[in-house]
Protein backbone atom coordinates (compact mmCIF):
# COMPACT_ATOMS: atom_id res chain seq x y z
CA UNK A 1 0.00 0.00 0.00
CA UNK A 2 1.40 3.41 -0.90
CA UNK A 3 1.65 6.20 1.63
CA UNK A 4 -1.09 8.81 1.74
CA UNK A 5 -0.24 12.44 1.05
CA UNK A 6 0.81 14.39 4.11
CA UNK A 7 -0.66 17.65 5.37
CA UNK A 8 1.63 20.69 5.26
CA UNK A 9 1.61 23.11 8.19
CA UNK A 10 3.89 25.71 9.77
CA UNK A 11 6.17 24.27 12.44
CA UNK A 12 5.27 25.35 15.97
CA UNK A 13 7.07 25.19 19.33
CA UNK A 14 7.16 21.54 20.33
CA UNK A 15 8.10 20.38 16.82
CA UNK A 16 11.84 20.62 17.46
CA UNK A 17 12.33 16.89 18.09
CA UNK A 18 10.55 15.93 14.87
CA UNK A 19 12.39 18.60 12.87
CA UNK A 20 15.79 17.60 14.20
CA UNK A 21 15.08 13.96 13.42
CA UNK A 22 14.22 14.83 9.83
CA UNK A 23 17.25 17.12 9.53
CA UNK A 24 19.39 14.21 10.75
CA UNK A 25 17.86 11.96 8.05
CA UNK A 26 18.66 14.56 5.39
CA UNK A 27 22.24 14.84 6.65
CA UNK A 28 22.66 11.06 6.36
CA UNK A 29 21.09 11.05 2.87
CA UNK A 30 23.44 13.83 1.73
CA UNK A 31 26.44 12.12 3.39
CA UNK A 32 26.89 15.18 5.64
CA UNK A 33 26.04 13.83 9.08
CA UNK A 34 29.59 14.68 10.22
CA UNK A 35 28.78 18.42 9.97
CA UNK A 36 25.41 18.34 11.74
CA UNK A 37 25.68 20.12 15.10
CA UNK A 38 22.17 21.63 15.43
CA UNK A 39 20.27 20.97 18.66
CA UNK A 40 16.61 21.30 19.58
CA UNK A 41 17.46 24.52 21.46
CA UNK A 42 19.11 25.88 18.32
CA UNK A 43 15.95 25.14 16.35
CA UNK A 44 13.81 26.86 18.98
CA UNK A 45 15.89 30.02 18.60
CA UNK A 46 15.99 29.78 14.82
CA UNK A 47 12.26 29.31 14.24
CA UNK A 48 10.29 30.42 17.29
CA UNK A 49 12.17 33.17 19.14
CA UNK A 50 11.17 36.80 18.67
CA UNK A 51 12.75 37.99 15.41
CA UNK A 52 13.56 34.40 14.39
CA UNK A 53 15.66 34.41 11.21
CA UNK A 54 14.02 31.40 9.53
CA UNK A 55 10.75 29.57 9.09
CA UNK A 56 9.93 25.88 8.93
CA UNK A 57 7.09 23.81 7.54
CA UNK A 58 6.26 20.24 8.50
CA UNK A 59 4.59 17.53 6.45
CA UNK A 60 2.53 15.23 8.69
CA UNK A 61 0.44 12.13 8.18
CA UNK A 62 -3.10 11.87 9.57
CA UNK A 63 -1.62 10.12 12.62
CA UNK A 64 0.70 13.07 13.28
CA UNK A 65 3.92 11.44 12.05
CA UNK A 66 6.33 14.02 10.61
CA UNK A 67 7.44 12.76 7.18
CA UNK A 68 8.98 15.86 5.63
CA UNK A 69 9.95 19.46 6.16
CA UNK A 70 11.10 22.65 4.51
CA UNK A 71 13.21 25.44 6.01
CA UNK A 72 13.34 28.90 4.43
CA UNK A 73 14.55 32.40 5.16
CA UNK A 74 14.35 35.80 3.51
CA UNK A 75 17.05 37.26 1.31
CA UNK A 76 17.23 40.23 -1.06
CA UNK A 77 18.02 40.79 -4.74
CA UNK A 78 19.77 44.06 -5.49
CA UNK A 79 19.12 43.54 -9.20
CA UNK A 80 15.38 43.21 -8.65
CA UNK A 81 15.33 45.57 -5.63
CA UNK A 82 12.96 43.07 -4.04
CA UNK A 83 13.00 40.51 -1.28
CA UNK A 84 13.43 36.85 -2.07
CA UNK A 85 13.07 33.55 -0.29
CA UNK A 86 15.91 31.09 0.08
CA UNK A 87 14.95 27.45 0.58
CA UNK A 88 17.57 26.00 2.91
CA UNK A 89 16.19 22.45 3.06
CA UNK A 90 13.38 20.40 1.63
CA UNK A 91 13.21 16.75 2.60
CA UNK A 92 10.63 13.98 2.41
CA UNK A 93 11.17 10.54 3.90
CA UNK A 94 11.68 7.85 1.23
CA UNK A 95 8.45 6.13 2.33
CA UNK A 96 6.48 9.24 1.34
CA UNK A 97 8.23 10.23 -1.88
CA UNK A 98 6.03 10.08 -4.93
CA UNK A 99 2.92 11.16 -2.97
CA UNK A 100 3.15 14.85 -3.89
CA UNK A 101 4.42 15.79 -0.43
CA UNK A 102 7.63 17.39 -1.70
CA UNK A 103 5.75 19.36 -4.32
CA UNK A 104 3.26 20.61 -1.72
CA UNK A 105 6.09 21.63 0.63
CA UNK A 106 7.63 23.67 -2.20
CA UNK A 107 4.24 25.15 -3.10
CA UNK A 108 3.80 26.23 0.53
CA UNK A 109 7.18 27.98 0.43
CA UNK A 110 6.20 29.57 -2.90
CA UNK A 111 3.05 30.96 -1.26
CA UNK A 112 5.22 32.43 1.51
CA UNK A 113 7.39 33.99 -1.19
CA UNK A 114 4.31 35.56 -2.79
CA UNK A 115 3.11 36.89 0.58
CA UNK A 116 6.52 38.54 1.00
CA UNK A 117 6.41 40.02 -2.54
CA UNK A 118 9.49 37.97 -3.39
CA UNK A 119 10.97 38.37 -6.83
CA UNK A 120 12.54 34.94 -6.68
CA UNK A 121 12.93 31.74 -4.74
CA UNK A 122 16.35 30.12 -4.71
CA UNK A 123 17.97 26.97 -3.39
CA UNK A 124 20.84 24.64 -4.15
CA UNK A 125 20.87 20.98 -5.08
CA UNK A 126 23.73 18.50 -4.93
CA UNK A 127 25.00 17.70 -8.42
CA UNK A 128 24.61 13.94 -7.86
CA UNK A 129 20.93 14.23 -6.87
CA UNK A 130 19.60 13.73 -10.40
CA UNK A 131 16.07 12.89 -9.21
CA UNK A 132 15.81 16.20 -7.38
CA UNK A 133 17.32 18.12 -10.32
CA UNK A 134 14.76 16.60 -12.69
CA UNK A 135 11.94 17.35 -10.24
CA UNK A 136 13.02 20.98 -9.78
CA UNK A 137 13.17 21.46 -13.54
CA UNK A 138 9.70 19.92 -13.91
CA UNK A 139 8.19 22.54 -11.58
CA UNK A 140 9.86 25.49 -13.32
CA UNK A 141 13.18 25.63 -11.47
CA UNK A 142 16.22 26.69 -13.46
CA UNK A 143 19.56 25.06 -12.64
CA UNK A 144 22.19 27.82 -12.88
CA UNK A 145 25.32 25.95 -13.97
CA UNK A 146 27.35 29.14 -14.30
CA UNK A 147 27.04 29.99 -10.58
CA UNK A 148 29.00 28.39 -7.75
CA UNK A 149 28.08 28.44 -4.08
CA UNK A 150 30.64 30.20 -1.90
CA UNK A 151 30.70 29.34 1.80
CA UNK A 152 32.70 30.80 4.65
CA UNK A 153 32.45 28.86 7.91
CA UNK A 154 32.41 30.41 11.37
CA UNK A 155 36.18 30.16 11.89
CA UNK A 156 36.88 31.68 8.48
CA UNK A 157 34.39 34.50 9.17
CA UNK A 158 36.12 35.33 12.46
CA UNK A 159 39.58 35.21 10.90
CA UNK A 160 38.58 37.32 7.91
CA UNK A 161 36.67 39.88 10.00
CA UNK A 162 39.68 40.31 12.28
CA UNK A 163 41.73 41.37 9.29
Where are these regions (language model features)?
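A conserved beta-strand-loop-helix scaffold within acyl/acetyltransferase catalytic domains
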Residues: 72-79
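A short beta-loop-alpha structural element at the N-terminal edge
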Residues: 7-19
